[in-house]
């Protein structure tokens, strides 16, 4: 449910303006996460591409419902985007990639009124526990920061 928020935060961190950015959403199959992200992003991302089997149906719906500029790509087509967002085990394309399904992306969450518990516990783990115990709703939690994985040639341990 937070995929669009994570993508927007990553775009902001990379300096990609939604009204000019070309964003590709890539997945090996249709999923609720892909559809929810596409619906949410189509509201403000100017150029949105879907690279998923049967993506034509979703693209058509978004064009009709939202008037969004959404087009589809075949999975073997070269993806020319400012940022490619890969869900699940989609093969990583060339260029800048946000691999949501790989676990390589680090996301920090925030919520209000954690009190003294935030000084004792890891804040992200505390927020997850509050959400799991129904003490916080999803709309009370926001994405604070997104750290992209290092490039292949970078050492993740260096500052």
Question: In which residue ranges do the predicted regions lie?
Answer:
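Rossmann-like adenosine-cofactor binding region
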Residues: 66-121
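Glycine-rich phosphate/diphosphate-binding loop of Rossmann-like nucleotide-binding domains
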Residues: 13-77
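Adenosine-phosphate binding glycine-rich loop
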Residues: 99-159
